[in-house]
A protein has these predicted regions:
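Acidic (Asp/Glu) carboxylate-rich active-site/surface patches
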Residues: 1-73, 83-88, 92-183
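Phosphate-recognition beta-domain surfaces
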Residues: 76
Length: 183
């Protein structure tokens, strides 16, 4: 009889896609530790499936525009509406069809997860651009115009020129690239 430690190691070394094939082998094992382990991995698999469904929905616009446009860039900002601090925008072009688990609006992700995602995005992206407008600039031109400015700088910072921008619910003035506002 395999030890619980060995069974756990088997699941840890297997790919998520292989877990369903492993479950029947251990479902009849009456040891509480094995049943707890099976429940943990079933829950992990369910969580993974839900994440894949969420990511699939996120790619809705890529699927919609992917045949017409070969280089699609997502752009978003952080810091809009601050009392102090800059507004920062990021523009990212990912390879078609690429999904990154945990990718979400920065406000919905922990600081630690943002750092992990940043590293993975930098590693896998076709191109990444960053733009910023300082607090002084925000005071000078207002937060909305400073946001547009940061977004323009982010697009200008890209190594590759996109042919479509997917923006966070805005149309950025003075950018001669087709834009689609998403919410």
């Amino acid at each position: 009889m395999q030890s619980i430690k060995d069974i756990k190691q088997l699941f840890e070394q297997a790919e998520k896609e292989q877990w369903n094939a492993l479950f029947p082998q251990y479902k009849t094992d009456e040891r509480a530790g094995v049943q707890k382990l099976i429940t943990q991995y079933e829950n992990k698999l369910l969580k993974h499936k839900k994440e894949q469904e969420r990511l699939y929905r996120m790619l809705e616009f890529e699927r919609k525009y992917g045949d017409e446009f070969s280089c699609i860039c997502g752009i978003d900002e952080a810091g809009r509406g601050p009392f102090a601090g800059p507004v920062v925008a990021g523009a990212v072009i990912l390879p078609k069809g690429l999904t990154i688990e945990g990718l979400n609006d920065s406000k919905q992700v922990s600081a630690k997860k943002r750092e992990e995602l940043y590293d993975e995005i930098k590693e896998k992206a076709v191109s990444v651009g960053i733009g910023m407008s300082s607090p002084a600039r925000i005071d000078e031109i207002n937060i909305l115009q400073a946001t547009y400015e940061a977004m323009r700088h982010a697009v200008e910072d890209l190594d590759v020129v996109p042919d479509l921008l997917l923006n966070d619910a805005v149309t950025i003035p003075l950018i001669p690239i087709r834009q689609v506002g998403i919410v």
